[in-house]
Curated annotation (Swiss-Prot):
Any GO CC annotation of this UniProt entry: ribonucleoprotein complex
UniProt keyword terms in alphabetical order: Ribonucleoprotein, Ribosomal protein
Stated family: Belongs to the bacterial ribosomal protein bL36 family.
Region described as Disordered: 1-45
GO molecular function: structural constituent of ribosome
One BP term from GO: translation
Protein name: Large ribosomal subunit protein bL36
Amino acid sequence: MKVSSSIKADPSKGDKLVRRKGRLYVINKKDPNRKQRQAGPARKK
């Protein structure tokens, strides 16, 4: 899964934008290698 500050979804390639637990994810059932997650704030220690 790629993690980047800004993610882009391409619906023509089967991408879907999903919000889970306050984070944005791109999921793709046709091509699972296209999974992405938007990087949020750093975790508190």
